[in-house]
């Protein structure tokens, strides 16, 4: 076999393998090179700059559309935000904020910082507390549950102390039911019909010696004389009632009865009615007068003194790790519950602010063509090396076919 025949056999596979192997690299270079327009004699050569540098703006927009349309979709961003805002991460962020806040508060001593803290407290109390009060009034079930819990845990188990029972007993005997009021009640009760009914009851229900006295004398005349005495001599009647109250030790007996009294002694129906009336009364008071009372109370506060006292307290207070952990856990739970319902809306509102499309377009347009080429070449060499190898193999195969064609042509 001479050299010419050997060349016909070997040269096409070698050349085809070289071309197939380096085609990808050559194609990528042809897409990017030259990076700038080539101008000769005032005339720009065709296909300069390369295809990608000449259309880098349109390429950037297509890349942005592809990324936002298939990769960074709203659902994908929602899932990403949900993973980023998991409960442990929220707790860690809140713990960091609390520690930072405590460190800063311990350093705050100048009057300007105190004024700023006072303004914050004033704004917070002036806006947040009224909204919180209105929200409580609107949430009927939540407010009723709180009132019922307070009623059952606090009010039902309360007892009056000796001093409180004495003061309440004095008020009942002197303010609510003084001797003059008792005398008027007795006069209203001792009507002719009531006197006759009392006399008949006494006659019917007495036995033994009392029956003889009741049926011979009765109580009608005695009650009529008592009524006449109370009506004609009011001052003397009041004195008799006061003396009788003192002799019977009503004040001491009433005080002892009040000390042992609890609301649980009342019938269940009465307690139910009392609970309903308490709910309605508190809700009506909060709705009508609570807001004005709160605003009036807040308006009279010295916010500067309150801020100074709060900062001094925070500066000198020793806050345990357990309290901080409980606080951050509760706040994280509240945020997690709110995010569970509002995260989708927050992500939708954040997308226009982030302007991801403009960001991607700007980054692609600002990247030099040489850097884009190097990045694509690196991807091809590291991730798509199999394609390069297949190109070389295909080149060798096509070269072998060409060698067979050449040899067949010579033989014919």
Swiss-Prot record:
Keyword terms, alphabetized: Cell inner membrane, Cell membrane, Membrane, Transmembrane, Transmembrane helix
Organism superkingdom: Bacteria
Major subcellular site: membrane
Regions crossing the membrane: 8-28, 390-410
Intracellular or extracellular location(s): Cell inner membrane
GO CC annotations on file: plasma membrane
Membrane topology classification: Multi-pass membrane protein
Similarity comment: family membership: Belongs to the UPF0754 family.
Name of the protein described by the UniProt record: UPF0754 membrane protein syc0451_d
Species of origin: Synechococcus sp. (strain ATCC 27144 / PCC 6301 / SAUG 1402/1)
């Amino acid at each position: 076999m001479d050299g010419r025949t050997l060349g016909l056999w070997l040269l096409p596979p070698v050349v085809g393998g070289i071309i197939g192997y380096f085609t990808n690299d050559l194609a990528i270079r042809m897409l990017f090179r030259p990076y700038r327009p080539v101008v000769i004699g005032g005339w720009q050569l065709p296909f300069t700059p390369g295809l990608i540098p000449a259309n880098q703006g349109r390429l950037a927009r297509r890349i942005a559309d592809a990324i936002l349309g298939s990769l960074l979709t709203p659902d994908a961003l929602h899932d990403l935000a949900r993973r980023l805002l998991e409960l442990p991460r929220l707790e860690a962020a809140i713990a960091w904020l609390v520690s930072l806040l405590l460190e800063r508060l311990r350093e705050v001593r100048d009057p300007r910082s105190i004024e700023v803290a006072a303004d914050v407290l004033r704004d917070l109390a002036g806006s947040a507390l009224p909204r919180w009060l209105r929200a409580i009034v609107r949430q009927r079930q939540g407010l009723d549950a709180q009132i019922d819990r307070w009623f059952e845990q606090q009010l039902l188990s309360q007892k009056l102390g000796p001093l409180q029972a004495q003061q309440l007993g004095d008020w009942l005997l002197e303010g609510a039911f003084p001797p003059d009021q008792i005398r008027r009640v007795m006069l209203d009760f001792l009507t002719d019909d009531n006197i006759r009914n009392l006399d008949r009851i006494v006659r019917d229900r007495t036995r033994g010696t009392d029956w003889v006295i009741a049926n011979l004398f009765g109580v009608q005349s005695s009650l009529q004389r008592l009524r006449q005495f109370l009506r004609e001599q009011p001052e003397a009647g009041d004195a008799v009632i006061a003396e009788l109250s003192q002799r019977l030790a009503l004040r001491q007996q009433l005080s002892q009865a009040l000390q042992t009294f609890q609301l649980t002694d009342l019938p269940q129906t009465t307690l139910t009615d009392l609970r309903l009336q308490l709910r309605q009364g508190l809700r009506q008071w909060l709705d009508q007068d609570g807001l004005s009372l709160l605003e009036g109370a807040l308006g009279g506060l010295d916010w500067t003194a309150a801020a100074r006292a709060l900062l001094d307290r925070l500066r000198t207070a020793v806050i345990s790790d357990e309290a901080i952990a409980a606080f951050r856990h509760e706040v994280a739970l509240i945020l997690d519950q709110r995010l569970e319902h509002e995260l989708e809306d927050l992500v939708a509102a954040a997308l226009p602010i982030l302007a991801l499309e403009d960001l991607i377009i700007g980054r692609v347009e600002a990247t030099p063509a040489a850097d884009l080429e190097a990045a694509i070449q690196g991807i091809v060499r590291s991730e798509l090396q199999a394609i390069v190898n297949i190109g070389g193999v295909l080149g060798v195969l096509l070269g072998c076919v060409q060698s067979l064609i050449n040899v067949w042509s010579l033989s014919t």
